[in-house]
Amino acid sequence: MPKGNGKVIAQNKKASHDYFIEDTYEAGIVLHGTEIKSIRNGRVNIKDSHARIDRKGEVQLINLHIAEYEQGNRYNHDPTRSRKLLLHRKEIDKLIGLTQQQGYALVPLKIYLKNGFAKVLIGLGKGKKKYDKREDLKQKQMKRDVDRAIKDHMR
């Protein structure tokens, strides 16, 4: 199964608006306790999250919010703790070199279930400037207008 396929739980639609995504990587997430149950229920938010490589060479997912499981007891998990991502050493070494360049960031694009395991698709993105965002919106609007005109013409 290619990377990014599976049952999509959460998607970061704002990432393609804020970043030029140059490359994507599939990573596993280290979860504790009832976190997987909350993910399967779809109670996860990746809107404000990002990934970072720490000094030990491990990739951490920061600000990922997984809501507490309703049927969980007092041993429920912390919703916003940082979670370790599982990548191959070669991929981590490549990401270390790329993220040290100015303007690059690791952005989670979507969380999905693949063969029963929670995976995250992270993208290596370069931040867009304000004029880039405006240009994308103009192109999107022009495409929408053309499609609408073609549809009206076909009637």
Curated annotation (Swiss-Prot):
CDD domains: SmpB. The keyword Lipid metabolism does not apply. Keywords: Cytoplasm, RNA-binding. GO terms for molecular function: RNA binding. Its main location: cytoplasm. Gene3D superfamilies: 2.40.280.10. GO terms for biological process: trans-translation. Belongs to the SmpB family. HAMAP family: SmpB. Required for rescue of stalled ribosomes mediated by trans-translation. Binds to transfer-messenger RNA (tmRNA), required for stable association of tmRNA with ribosomes. tmRNA and SmpB together mimic tRNA shape, replacing the anticodon stem-loop with SmpB. tmRNA is encoded by the ssrA gene; the 2 termini fold to resemble tRNA(Ala) and it encodes a 'tag peptide', a short internal open reading frame. During trans-translation Ala-aminoacylated tmRNA acts like a tRNA, entering the A-site of stalled ribosomes, displacing the stalled mRNA. This is SsrA-binding protein.
